[in-house]
Amino acid sequence: MNQGKVWRVVKPTVGVPVYLGAVAVTALILHGGLLAKTDWFGAYWNGGKKAAAAAAAVAPAPVAAPQAPAQ
């Protein structure tokens, strides 16, 4: 590890959470930007055409209108 001496300046109890937090924030910003700027990424996360086809296949059949009683 070529940057091993950094822990002489920054305590690991501070540096590791800050580093992991920065990675998490970067990932959230990246994914948020992809969702906001593209139309395919949200569909990819939702299953795309497969999910739409499955939802259409599971849709309930239409119900017939009630008939007026015969007099």
Curated annotation (Swiss-Prot):
Q: Which family does it belong to?
A: Belongs to the antenna complex alpha subunit family.
**Its membrane topology:** Multi-pass membrane protein
Q: Name one GO cellular component term.
A: plasma membrane
Intrachain S-S bonds? none
Q: Which residues lie on this side of the membrane: Periplasmic?
A: 37-50
Q: Where in the cell is it found?
A: Cell membrane
Protein name, as recorded: Light-harvesting protein B-800/850 alpha chain
Where are the membrane-spanning stretches?
16-36, 51-71
Q: How does it assemble?
A: An alpha/beta heterodimer conjugated to 3 bacteriochlorophyll molecules. The core complex is formed by different alpha and beta chains, binding bacteriochlorophyll molecules, and arranged most probably in tetrameric structures disposed around the reaction center. The non-pigmented gamma chains may constitute additional components.
Q: Say if the entry is tagged with keyword 4Fe-4S.
A: no
Q: Which organism encodes this protein? A: Rubrivivax gelatinosus (Rhodocyclus gelatinosus)
Q: Which UniProt keywords apply?
A: Antenna complex, Bacteriochlorophyll, Cell membrane, Chlorophyll, Chromophore, Light-harvesting polypeptide, Magnesium, Membrane, Metal-binding, Transmembrane, Transmembrane helix
